Curated annotation (Swiss-Prot):
Protein name listed in UniProt: DNA-directed RNA polymerase subunit beta
Source organism superkingdom: Bacteria
EC number(s) recorded for this UniProt protein: 2.7.7.6
Gene Ontology cellular-component terms listed: DNA-directed RNA polymerase complex
Organism: Thermus aquaticus
Quaternary organization: The RNAP catalytic core consists of 2 alpha, 1 beta, 1 beta' and 1 omega subunit. When a sigma factor is associated with the core the holoenzyme is formed, which can initiate transcription.
Family in the record: Belongs to the RNA polymerase beta chain family.
Catalysed conversion reaction: RNA(n) + a ribonucleoside 5'-triphosphate = RNA(n+1) + diphosphate
PANTHER family associated with the record: DNA-DIRECTED RNA POLYMERASE I SUBUNIT 2
SUPFAM superfamilies the record matches: beta and beta-prime subunits of DNA dependent RNA-polymerase (SSF64484)
UniProt function note: DNA-dependent RNA polymerase catalyzes the transcription of DNA into RNA using the four ribonucleoside triphosphates as substrates.
Amino acid sequence: MEIKRFGRIREVIPLPPLTEIQVESYKKALQADVPPEKRENVGIQAAFKETFPIEEGDKGKGGLVLDFLEYRIGDPPFSQDECREKDLTYQAPLYARLQLIHKDTGLIKEDEVFLGHLPLMTEDGSFIINGADRVIVSQIHRSPGVYFTPDPARPGRYIASIIPLPKRGPWIDLEVEASGVVTMKVNKRKFPLVLLLRVLGYDQETLVRELSAYGDLVQGLLDEAVLAMRPEEAMVRLFTLLRPGDPPKKDKALAYLFGLLADPKRYDLGEAGRYKAEEKLGVGLSGRTLVRFEDGEFKDEVFLPTLRYLFALTAGVPGHEVDDIDHLGNRRIRTVGELMADQFRVGLARLARGVRERMVMGSPDTLTPAKLVNSRPLEAALREFFSRSQLSQFKDETNPLSSLRHKRRISALGPGGLTRERAGFDVRDVHRTHYGRICPVETPEGANIGLITSLAAYARVDALGFIRTPYRRVKNGVVTEEVVYMTASEEDRYTIAQANTPLEGDRIATDRVVARRRGEPVIVAPEEVEFMDVSPKQVFSLNTNLIPFLEHDDANRALMGSNMQTQAVPLIRAQAPVVMTGLEERVVRDSLAALYAEEDGEVVKVDGTRIAVRYEDGRLVEHPLRRYARSNQGTAFDQRPRVRVGQRVKKGDLLADGPASEEGFLALGQNVLVAIMPFDGYNFEDAIVISEELLKRDFYTSIHIERYEIEARDTKLGPERITRDIPHLSEAALRDLDEEGIVRIGAEVKPGDILVGRTSFKGEQEPSPEERLLRSIFGEKARDVKDTSLRVPPGEGGIVVGRLRLRRGDPGVELKPGVREVVRVFVAQKRKLQVGDKLANRHGNKGVVAKILPVEDMPHLPDGTPVDVILNPLGVPSRMNLGQILETHLGLAGYFLGQRYISPVFDGATEPEIKELLAEAFNLYFGKRQGEGFGVDKREKEVLARAEKLGLVSPGKSPEEQLKELFDLGKVVLYDGRTGEPFEGPIVVGQMFIMKLYHMVEDKMHARSTGPYSLITQQPLGGKAQFGGQRFGEMEVWALEAYGAAHTLQEMLTIKSDDIEGRNAAYQAIIKGEDVPEPSVPESFRVLVKELQALALDVQTLDEKDNPVDIFEGLASKR
């Protein structure tokens, strides 16, 4: 099929790798393939360097030191597929070469020590933890550094905050009090800053000289009594203020202050904090602490420059300004590598504590590095992070786009971050610095709005964690090929033009240019422009960039369209959209859902399970295909060959399509012929009418695979057994089980059918003499077992497509304590579209299928072509998502011309271009009509006459010309399939791309007749998972009261709910065909009485004659 490209803006640079934020970050943290001597001081290398050397405490017997030399990462013991199958973690062993040094004897023992396992990242950027694919979401937080903010309590005053890395030191606030005294607040204690400045060696003369420009403010800082002290005295005085309970000793004070401000192991601004502090204060720092300790004295790094800036800000000196904490120059991303390294550091600190204890306890002569180190604390810390952290999430694998989006998510929640309840509007809002860095459209709709966002398409995260976006350099009005990646802070210094600025060659073509400076729009001469956007795509995330004509959609609906694409279910007959945006191929390629050729070569073998290619370098590579694998969300992951034997392939050519891809293009739904018109109220309120033909052609059929699992345990009564020998079951019920009691592959199973047979021993009383006799004759066989088999849950079923049996003792199998074996059965369902399923397009138009019409009843074109879907026109104006109408018009042209289109966002097809294509399509369509011998009939002319009155067509023109005018508007005359008559007015018809979403009615439909009850309230449980009932709430009670339906209401509140005795009596009566008796007391009333009695209130129930009634009488025996 021919692909026609729109778009006038040349792509200067390709998109960066889409999973780079995950893959590169983790690679850098591990540095597994870097020789030890060339490793940078980042990630786990930095964690080792910070923790080691570990020295024996003061109380030690002789001085022992454990030092670190290098580490290496071994090979993973199991493949990724084995890990998924056996519920293992995809990980590799970590070894460290350590030295134990005896200080007094100089003896050195060296050893390679096993430090546990380190989870490895798969090539697509996710992890396999306990058999499940997981993603570590990047976290955005306030960067460490020095910040100046207005004091909310006192206008015109400011607070300077010095913020370290999370959990790597205290926050420090400096402020000028109302009295003029400059105070410092640390660990919730406030003291005059001059005290610390004296400890740092400043005297009155120096302070006056350094701060002479701020006369009045300096007077509030100076305290002659303090400045007359020696630094050591000031240090002890400061220590007594910070630790009032501790004895004021010089050595204690020194150790405390060193740990608080100068110890690199306990206080750390981080590289990003150091960079931000230097940038803000205009000074160079020697390290990442606030104070350095040299020759027994403290030397200031940060405090005086911070104070100078605070004074300048208070005095209103130009060039000094407060910080915007939501500016992306002040917020940074903590990627997976940093998050893991932080946790690794925590684990190493616990390990070091254990090492110190063993140094003290053990004999120095017999100790070795291996005896000192216990790897458990480190492994536990990593396990905790990967399996339980708020940022470690179950991977969304609904379709390839979902998994890619999940890896590019940025969350402000999580440890050290915000909470939903505390986050205000400012932090959630779109900020001007989001431009090209964080998508302004894609974010969840609920409580997490604005807290969870997505990385923009071209954005990259730099080594310090700041998000950079690319710009082309402009010199004297000429756009160069030089591309510069800039942080938000750097961008604020320049004037930047938009990507769609008109160019003649490389020169800006207009004499005035719309540009922006610090986020504000300005109109400037071409010579003033310093940079230019690389592409309109750079503003939005991947999902949003997949919406054609995005510029015509309201942002609220674009948000829904972005989010709903990730909920699209892969269909068995996937179709790429007729109207694309140009990113569809790249998404499939970077998600690794499809298979591509590694080099140039020739295909030598193709079958349903593998593709073999002989590459030109002589290698014969077999590429295995994943067929009908279950994704985390239960959708089918299936790869289908797209090459033939003997076919020549080039490097990067498509070998096999993955789920939701067609010829390597993302294919989340189907292109269907849509009419936008009301239809007898069946499409009221976003409901959708579809043609039965879609079901016949399997257009919206998807495969879903459910996983069922059962364990056989060792119990106190005896072991549970997986067996076919189940008591009290007919042979018919067991017909699909093999001799081991597991259902065969290919069997069709329905609700209640047995998947895995299991028997468990019954709990029993003391056996009777007769039973004991039988047991002695027949052995243990007579002991009673009960059927505890795994059955298909209500409302589920399908075809058994896989089974797996894991036994304790099998290689690589790790089962929970007490579990002897686990059996898993995979059941696949082929789901056709049905009434109640949710459909949506890319523009945020979503609805539920309300009616499936026979194809003969669907509206049809004059040539008899029936439409596939009828959408309500009222779904468009109020939602303001007109992009879908333009897509439909362009789709109509594509339908007749047999073309596909690429229309990039903010640079797509214009109205004149669409009209031109529609004119071409009309000539083809009408020429075909005339060729088949039918022109414009009488009924069509009536519709045209009405259209003329509405001003849709020009009066006085021939019917053919009027039809062409309508076609230029994307409208045609449509006939009612039920009556054969045309509808009154012309109707918009065209191809629209519509997806079936994960919210399928089959998963939500639920009915209960008899089921489980809650133990305390004796009311039916709630929800489909518990096989619960429908809640009859207070509003439903009001409805029955309003109707006066007293008996129905009484039944609802008693025997249908929690009246145990009444329930049983009613059951008996129905069986015997008698009248249902009067209800008794509901259990919830008894619970209420008991709760009141528990509050020491005397509650009595009386009859009409005030005689006491015991509502608990005989209850124990009846239960």
